[in-house]
């Protein structure tokens, strides 16, 4: 049971949502697939805020097994306390227990025939005529696994893509530093609404409060600052904007991590290899959210790899259809969010307040172009930021 076989059609590195969905679709479509996870337990350590849009389109029913809260919208809070309420769209979804959700996705993949190796670290790749030799330390024993295809789903710190000569996001301006408490005894504005706070309290980022059943995820993501992310977060806990709603809060878990918010990497495929999820920059540069996007790109990756196996064509030319397909669905969204993030990072507190005072307090949808016109009409000095959006 512990030993790895000598060869597989597809080796997926990383058992997060991107990796598990990749292996699921590869196995489902007939490829002999190995899913490798460095942690001894899939889903740990948790490094994200755990909010996701609806998942029914993936053929997954929202289950109380992993869903902790249903989300119907969000409050966007300006430095002066002005609240903008947004409902529907991508704010409609869930907060999940990632420890359980990630394991659920891996189990779903295993039921399609995927072999899973936990507490396993890829220590190197060697290109061969047939594909790759993957060097794996599995439960303390060294293995060399032959494979025709590798899917790099090993996260923001991806080493697999770099072993293969594809750049992953590691520039400090492209990775958001995140810290989060899971807390109990928190009073929310609404138990089914997320809260986001912006401004100098969180340089070039935002602070979030996400309902999670009996607890709340209270976190921060910043690009730069004079202090560590955790120091900004600790300062926020007593911020007057909260009106004492966290004064009795008690942390039950602490999480840290990095989020690749610089947009997708330049190229996500080459001969015998595909990059997906955080490793590929499949993350909204604006919000830092990427679970749903990673899942969808993972499905595409798995399907393309299975087709590659059945056609016995593992070339860069054949695998390019993976990038073509995910870009058709998601590239415009990612690049727009990168543009919006760049604008947001230039705004000071007074300018953020001016924006909040220029738009309706209740938004059923977010049309950035229309909002930009409203903002500039009321605050013409902001035209320098929004002229390319109008």
Swiss-Prot record:
Protein name per Swiss-Prot or TrEMBL: Digeranylgeranylglycerophospholipid reductase
Listed pathway(s): Membrane lipid metabolism; glycerophospholipid metabolism
Presence of keyword Thylakoid: no
InterPro entries: DGGGPL_reductase, FAD/NAD-bd_sf, Geranylgeranyl_Rdtase_fam, Geranylgeranyl_reductase, GGR_cat
Reactions that this protein is recorded to catalyse: a 2,3-bis-O-phytanyl-sn-glycerol 1-phospholipid + 8 A = a 2,3-bis-O-(geranylgeranyl)-sn-glycerol 1-phospholipid + 8 AH2; 2,3-bis-O-(phytanyl)-sn-glycerol 1-phosphate + 8 A = 2,3-bis-O-(geranylgeranyl)-sn-glycerol 1-phosphate + 8 AH2; CDP-2,3-bis-O-(geranylgeranyl)-sn-glycerol + 8 AH2 = CDP-2,3-bis-O-(phytanyl)-sn-glycerol + 8 A; archaetidylserine + 8 AH2 = 2,3-bis-O-phytanyl-sn-glycero-3-phospho-L-serine + 8 A
Known function: Is involved in the reduction of 2,3-digeranylgeranylglycerophospholipids (unsaturated archaeols) into 2,3-diphytanylglycerophospholipids (saturated archaeols) in the biosynthesis of archaeal membrane lipids. Catalyzes the formation of archaetidic acid (2,3-di-O-phytanyl-sn-glyceryl phosphate) from 2,3-di-O-geranylgeranylglyceryl phosphate (DGGGP) via the hydrogenation of each double bond of the isoprenoid chains.
Coiled coil: none
Example GO BP: glycerophospholipid biosynthetic process
EC number(s) stated in the UniProt entry for this protein: 1.3.-.-
Cofactors required: FAD
Remaining remarks: Reduction reaction proceeds via syn addition of hydrogen for double bonds.
Amino acids binding a 2,3-bis-O-(geranylgeranyl)-sn-glycerol 1-phospholipid: 368
Family: Belongs to the geranylgeranyl reductase family. DGGGPL reductase subfamily.
One GO CC term on file: membrane
NCBIfam families: GG-red-SF
Enzyme category, top tier: oxidoreductase
Keywords per UniProt: FAD, Flavoprotein, Lipid biosynthesis, Lipid metabolism, Oxidoreductase, Phospholipid biosynthesis, Phospholipid metabolism
Cofactor annotation comment: Binds 1 FAD per subunit.
């Amino acid at each position: 049971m512990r030993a790895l076989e000598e060869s597989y059609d597809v080796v997926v590195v990383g058992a997060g949502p991107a990796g598990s969905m990749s292996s699921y679709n590869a196995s489902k479509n007939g490829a002999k697939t190995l899913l490798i996870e460095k942690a001894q337990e899939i889903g740990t350590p948790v490094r994200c805020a755990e909010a996701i849009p609806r998942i029914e389109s993936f053929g997954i029913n929202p289950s109380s097994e992993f869903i902790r809260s249903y989300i119907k919208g969000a409050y966007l809070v300006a430095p002066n306390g002005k609240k903008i309420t947004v409902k529907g769209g991508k704010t409609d979804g869930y907060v999940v227990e990632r420890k359980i959700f990630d394991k659920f996705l891996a189990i779903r993949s295993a039921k399609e025939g995927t072999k899973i190796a936990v507490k396993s670290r890829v220590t190197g790749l060697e290109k061969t005529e047939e594909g790759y030799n993957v060097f794996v330390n599995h439960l303390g024993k060294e293995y060399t696994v032959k494979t025709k295809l590798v899917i790099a789903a090993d996260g923001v710190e991806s080493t697999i893509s770099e072993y293969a000569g594809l750049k992953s996001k590691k520039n400090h301006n492209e990775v958001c530093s995140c810290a989060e408490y899971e807390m109990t005894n928190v009073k929310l504005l609404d138990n089914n609404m997320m809260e986001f706070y912006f401004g100098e309290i969180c340089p070039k980022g935002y602070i979030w409060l996400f309902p999670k059943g009996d607890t709340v995820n209270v976190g921060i993501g910043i690009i730069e600052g004079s202090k560590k992310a955790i120091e900004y977060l600790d300062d926020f806990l007593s911020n007057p904007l909260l009106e004492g709603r966290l004064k009795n809060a008690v942390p039950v878990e602490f999480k840290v991590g990095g989020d690749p918010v610089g947009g997708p990497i330049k190229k996500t495929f080459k001969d015998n290899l595909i990059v997906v999820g955080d490793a590929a920059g499949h993350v909204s540069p604006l919000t830092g959210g990427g679970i749903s996007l990673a899942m969808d790109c993972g499905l595409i990756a798995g399907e393309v790899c299975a087709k590659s196996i059945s056609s016995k064509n593992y070339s860069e030319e054949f695998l390019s259809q993976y990038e073509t397909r995910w870009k058709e669905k998601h590239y415009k969204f990612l690049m727009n969010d990168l543009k919006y993030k760049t604008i947001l990072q230039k705004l000071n507190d007074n300018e953020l307040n001016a924006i909040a005072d220029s738009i309706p307090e209740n938004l059923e949808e977010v049309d950035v172009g229309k909002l930009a016109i409203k903002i500039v009409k009321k605050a013409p000095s902001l035209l320098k930021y929004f002229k390319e959006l109008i």
